Amino acid sequence: MESLSQLVKSTLPNYLSNLPIPDSVGGWFKLSFKDWLALIPPTVVVAGIGYTGYLAFCPAAQARCSATKSGRCNNQIRKHEPKVVDTIDVEDIADKAAFCRCWKSKNWPYCDGSHGEHNKLTGDNVGPVVVKKQ
């Protein structure tokens, strides 16, 4: 407890009072490289506290964080379908090809069915893009 008291009562105030904070706007332009380096640690601490507060209290940040933790690839496209499959007719394809949209295929860009296991684990409905010759 004594070390914490020493930190709060003596060390931290001395550190903050010795920071090269200029008195005017023009003073910021006169700071040396060493002075700018001395200002980096407190700036990082303030930015970290601000970012933590943003994540804790901003509803948009909370929604974005919870959406990425779901493990889903597809969070909004045709969610009412059990599997999203698009067929595109292209004359240059020899017969037909299935292209991966889940980024989990070992044979990417071709689909190897990896989305099936992904869909079971996450409840997602992603499927391949099937391209066939007409």
UniProtKB/Swiss-Prot annotation:
Organism placement in taxonomy: Eukaryota, Metazoa, Ecdysozoa, Arthropoda, Hexapoda
One Pfam family here: MitoNEET_N
Keyword Metal-binding in record: yes
Keywords: 2Fe-2S, Endoplasmic reticulum, Iron, Iron-sulfur, Membrane, Metal-binding, Transmembrane, Transmembrane helix
Residue ranges, Lumenal side: 1-35
Subcellular location(s) of the protein: Endoplasmic reticulum membrane
Species of origin: Drosophila ananassae
Family: Belongs to the CISD protein family. CISD2 subfamily.
Residues annotated as binding [2Fe-2S] cluster: C100, C102, C111, H115
GO cellular component: endoplasmic reticulum membrane; mitochondrial outer membrane
GO biological process: intracellular iron ion homeostasis; mitochondrial transport; regulation of autophagy
Cofactor(s) needed by this chain: [2Fe-2S] cluster
Bilayer topology term: Single-pass membrane protein
Domain of life: Eukaryota
GO molecular function, one term: 2 iron, 2 sulfur cluster binding
Residues annotated as transmembrane: 36-58
Keyword Transmembrane annotated: yes
Cytoplasmic topological domain residue ranges: 59-134
Gene name of the record: Cisd2
Protein name: CDGSH iron-sulfur domain-containing protein 2 homolog
Cross-referenced PANTHER family: CDGSH IRON-SULFUR DOMAIN-CONTAINING PROTEIN 1
Cofactor mode of binding and number, as noted: Binds 1 [2Fe-2S] cluster.
